[in-house]
Amino acid sequence: MNTPVSLRIDFVSDIACPWCAVGLSALERALERLDGTVSAELHFQPFELNPQMGPEGEDVTEHLTRKYGSTSEQQAQIRETIRQRGAQEGFAFNAEGRGRIWNTFDAHRLLHWAGEEGAPVQQHALKKALLVAYHGRAENPSDATVLLACVREVGLDETRARAILAGDDFADEVREREQFYTSHGIHSVPAVIINERHLISGGHPSESFEQALRQIAQQA
């Protein structure tokens, strides 16, 4: 029996990004099909689509119109496309949409903490919980109550998380990671980096991830 090929996967993304929810679910399905062939360790890296977003957030329709010039009808079509893609990969988007765009910096600080002081599986679980809270239930991912509920859900230390949110722990580390990836050409997400060498950009179907990972594993 062959030994599975070990792969490091850095998943660069933002909780605010619906395609990141689709992409992560697709990647997970691909890895399930490659079980026994590939042994992957996922690391979640920060990217902010709207780093200047204030605590009050912004209506999602107004935000997308201002940022991209899209009409509400165009946005509805895109939202339905994303919803269908999510359903294909096992991610259920909230039927009414997200409602508002929020700042995600504190969520990234907690994810960094989970990666530093927790196990990779806990960081992965927290990422999933945050994506479901925002895209699945339209909750506010900048709200400490929502963030702490996600922390509890995945079994991380709520007292430590509360202290992080009350201060500025891991703020510099998150900004450094964001700068690292943007300086290396990552300007859209999701970006999936395999073994720090191979880049897969975008929320591809699970079949595409499976094919790419299989090829990379054969070369490793």
Q: What is the predicted role of each segment?
A:
Residues 4-12, 16-36, 44, 111-112, ...:
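C-terminal cap of thioredoxin/glutaredoxin-like
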Residues 24-134:
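Structural alpha/beta surface segment adjacent to cysteine/selenocysteine redox centers
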